[in-house]
């Protein structure tokens, strides 16, 4: 690319409270030639609040693969473009992946501007472990597909983060209760940074019952933070994969060393694996 090639800016916008916009974002909006937005009417109101008037280009889930190349050509011709979503950080459960991929493949500079993200905002206030987490976005709309997805991640020991909508929250919690267990701890963060912001934690079963008590509690933008499945110290619950690994490694190394390696790989206590090996593997 030449020095005249434009820059694609990935710009985060507020998730509710308009005061959360960054100074750098406002300066970027002021200097770009075009703003690619998920919903041009919604974003028009947002930028109007800050006194910014710029041409818009509609880029959403239904047209991105078809239209991204148009923006790439504009960038090649020297236009600077800002990509925004309706709220929060673009590409996080929002359009933009295909555009960014095409820009990088074309050698166009992509500059991310950090800012609000509902998932991270909710996680940091949840009181659930935040050192390791797995963002899953929106679960499938149909119960069967939703349960299948939950079953695939039911054994995950990392914190799980989901987005959910008003009209599906109760059904989703019902399926979570069936697959993950009614006692799994969960935090619901609703309407983050807005007037009716609510952050509440309980077991999945109790949280669903709490929502049923007042229909207003099911309204708004929602983030679910689910505690990962705890590692068990019970020898009988050592996974088949861990047992197989222990068997294979113990053929080449002393059992104590094999137990230490498998413990590191699968998150079990070394002594639990060692005792299991003594009982089941040693001849």
Swiss-Prot record:
Subcellular location: Cytoplasm
Name of the gene: rsmI
MF-aspect GO terms: rRNA (cytosine-2'-O-)-methyltransferase activity
Disulphide connectivity of cysteines: none
Protein's job: Catalyzes the 2'-O-methylation of the ribose of cytidine 1402 (C1402) in 16S rRNA.
Main location (coarse class): cytoplasm
Pfam families: RsmI_C (PF23016), TP_methylase (PF00590)
Reaction catalysed by this enzyme: cytidine(1402) in 16S rRNA + S-adenosyl-L-methionine = 2'-O-methylcytidine(1402) in 16S rRNA + S-adenosyl-L-homocysteine + H(+)
Keywords: Cytoplasm, Methyltransferase, rRNA processing, S-adenosyl-L-methionine, Transferase
Family classification: Belongs to the methyltransferase superfamily. RsmI family.
UniProt xrefs under CDD domains: RsmI
UniProt cross-references to PROSITE patterns, sorted A to Z: RSMI (PS01296)
PANTHER family from the UniProt entry: RIBOSOMAL RNA SMALL SUBUNIT METHYLTRANSFERASE I (PTHR46111:SF1)
Protein EC: 2.1.1.198
Protein name: Ribosomal RNA small subunit methyltransferase I
Organism expressing this protein natively: Haemophilus influenzae (strain ATCC 51907 / DSM 11121 / KW20 / Rd)
GO cellular component terms given for this protein: cytoplasm
InterPro entries: 4pyrrol_Mease, 4pyrrol_Methylase_sf, 4pyrrole_Mease_sub1, 4pyrrole_Mease_sub2, rRNA_ssu_MeTfrase_I, RsmI_HTH, SAM_MeTrfase_RsmI_CS
């Amino acid at each position: 690319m030449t020095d005249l090639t434009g820059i694609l800016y990935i710009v985060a916008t507020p998730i509710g409270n308009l005061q959360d916009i960054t100074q750098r974002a406002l300066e970027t909006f002021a200097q770009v030639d075009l703003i690619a937005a998920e919903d041009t009417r919604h974003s028009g109101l947002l930028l109007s609040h800050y006194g910014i008037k710029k041409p818009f280009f509609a880029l959403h889930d239904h047209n991105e693969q078809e239209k991204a190349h148009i923006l790439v050509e504009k960038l090649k011709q020297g236009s600077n473009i800002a990509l925004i979503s309706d709220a929060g950080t673009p590409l996080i459960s929002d359009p933009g992946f295909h555009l960014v991929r095409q820009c990088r493949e074309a050698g166009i500079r992509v500059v991310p501007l950090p800012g609000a993200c509902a998932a991270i905002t909710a996680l940091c206030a949840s009181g659930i472990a935040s050192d390791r987490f797995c963002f899953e976005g929106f679960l499938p709309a149909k119960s069967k597909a939703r349960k299948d997805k939950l079953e695939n991640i039911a054994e995950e020991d990392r914190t799980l983060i989901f987005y959910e909508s008003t009209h599906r929250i109760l059904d989703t919690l019902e399926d979570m209760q069936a697959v993950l267990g009614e006692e799994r701890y969960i935090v619901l963060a609703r309407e983050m940074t807005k007037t009716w912001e609510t952050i509440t934690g309980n077991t999945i079963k109790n949280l669903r019952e709490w929502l049923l008590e007042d229909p207003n509690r099911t309204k708004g933008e929602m983030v679910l933070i689910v505690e990962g499945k705890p590692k068990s110290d019970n020898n009988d619950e050592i996974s088949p994969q861990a047992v197989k690994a222990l068997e294979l490694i113990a053929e080449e190394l002393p059992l104590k060393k094999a137990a230490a390696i498998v413990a590191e790989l699968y998150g079990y206590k070394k002594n639990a694996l060692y005792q299991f090996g003594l009982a089941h593997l040693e001849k």
